[in-house]
């Protein structure tokens, strides 16, 4: 069992070590701990025996172990602090007009990567929860067309496709009518289910020749089932991890699954220390935090860094960016839902 004084010593060692990355001796703690050097050494020995501290090879001092960082996160980390000293920089970074959601999320990820020195991932609302609110087909040439999807009245996705040889122009109109009749207002998850169950049963009502229609559906709808993953500071991974971790972030769908897996449905924040099931991330820390996207749901900001990062500083940075990001998104979606021509 960790005593109150031992917990104070562990917290202080973590604070010093994450700033200096040097082993900490008892003398460095005496100014902050109201105990003798011998007492502090005994407590450090007790913490080492419990696996929360470990010896350094090049010094007589001690450094936190992985278990020590995990204990700190569970018992001492404050999740509601704001990095007030960086608030002005964050507000200034968002103080201009954005033209789409992706640019706003990219700005948040870039800024957090810059402030934290870590790799950052930003995710939109989970695709399966988004609703199809508009659909159109634009003919590009004699043989190609573009399917245009609008999700949640704000997120536009396009899918270019080759018009099947047996398709007439009227068939494209029928395809558009079928989607608008059956899918508008439905969640992406429901659409995914209907393409596999309902659509094969009813396409003969719309098409005289049904060859390739199901394959065409699967092709043009494929992109709306995929996560839009924004990654910033990826090269920084190589400062504290290896090439396998770097390459992991090339697979955006695996990245999205890993980040979403780090947060339970009812969790707003999570800090996982060396706890990933992905072997290439198993010695890293993942700090995840949900942020509100008005009218639509929650996105996620995640920081991927070394185990020995300054947890309190990074969590505070995530909090302040989340707060300013939510304010910016509120303005953005308020504008989208307003009359464009109204006088302000």
Curated annotation (Swiss-Prot):
Q: Which SUPFAM superfamilies match?
A: GAF domain-like, Winged helix' DNA-binding domain
Molecular functions per Gene Ontology: DNA binding
InterPro entries tied to this protein: GAF-like_dom_sf, HrcA, HrcA_C, WH-like_DNA-bd_sf, WH_DNA-bd_sf, WHTH_HrcA_DNA-bd, WHTH_transcript_rep_HrcA_IDD
Fetch the Pfam families from UniProt. Answer: HrcA (PF01628), HrcA_DNA-bdg (PF03444)
- UniProt keyword terms in alphabetical order: Repressor, Stress response, Transcription, Transcription regulation
Q: Which GO biological process entries does UniProt record here?
A: negative regulation of DNA-templated transcription
Transmembrane ranges? none
State the similarity comment: Belongs to the HrcA family.
Its function?
Negative regulator of class I heat shock genes (grpE-dnaK-dnaJ and groELS operons). Prevents heat-shock induction of these operons.
Looking up PANTHER family in the UniProt record yields:
HEAT-INDUCIBLE TRANSCRIPTION REPRESSOR HRCA
Q: What is this protein called?
A: Heat-inducible transcription repressor HrcA
Native species? Streptococcus gordonii (strain Challis / ATCC 35105 / BCRC 15272 / CH1 / DL1 / V288)
Gene name of the record:
hrcA
């Amino acid at each position: 069992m960790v005593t109150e004084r031992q917990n104070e010593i562990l917290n202080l060692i973590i604070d010093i070590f994450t700033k200096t990355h040097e082993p900490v001796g008892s003398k460095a703690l005496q100014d902050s701990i109201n105990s003798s050097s011998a007492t502090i050494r005994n407590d450090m020995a007790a913490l080492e025996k419990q696996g929360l501290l470990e010896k350094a090879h090049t010094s007589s001092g001690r450094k936190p172990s992985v278990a020590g960082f995990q204990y700190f996160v569970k018992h001492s980390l404050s999740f509601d602090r704001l990095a007030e000293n960086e608030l002005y920089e964050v507000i200034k970074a968002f103080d201009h007009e954005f033209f789409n959601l992706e640019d706003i999320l990219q700005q948040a990820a870039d800024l957090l990567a810059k402030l934290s020195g870590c790799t950052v991932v930003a995710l939109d609302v989970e695709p399966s929860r988004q609703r199809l609110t508009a659909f159109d087909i634009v003919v590009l040439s004699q043989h190609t067309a573009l399917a245009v999807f609008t999700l949640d009245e704000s997120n536009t996705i396009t899918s270019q496709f080759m018009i099947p040889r047996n398709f007439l122009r009227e068939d494209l109109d029928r395809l558009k009518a079928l989607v608008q009749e059956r899918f508008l207002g439905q969640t992406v998850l429901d659409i995914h289910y209907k393409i596999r169950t309902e659509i094969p049963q009813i396409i003969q009502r719309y098409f005289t020749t049904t060859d390739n229609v199901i394959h065409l559906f699967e092709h043009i709808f494929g992109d709306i089932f995929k996560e839009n993953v924004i990654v910033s500071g990826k090269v920084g991974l190589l400062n504290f991890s290896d090439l396998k971790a770097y390459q992991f972030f090339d697979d955006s769908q695996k990245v999205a699954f890993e980040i979403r897996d780090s947060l339970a449905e009812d969790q707003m924040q999570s800090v996982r220390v060396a706890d990933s099931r992905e072997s290439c991330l198993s010695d890293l820390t993942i700090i995840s935090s949900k942020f509100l996207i008005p009218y639509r749901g929650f996105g996620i900001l995640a920081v991927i860094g070394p185990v020995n990062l300054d947890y309190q500083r990074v969590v505070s940075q995530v909090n302040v960016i989340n707060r300013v990001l939510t304010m910016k998104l509120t303005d953005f979606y308020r504008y989208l839902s307003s009359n464009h021509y109204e006088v302000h």
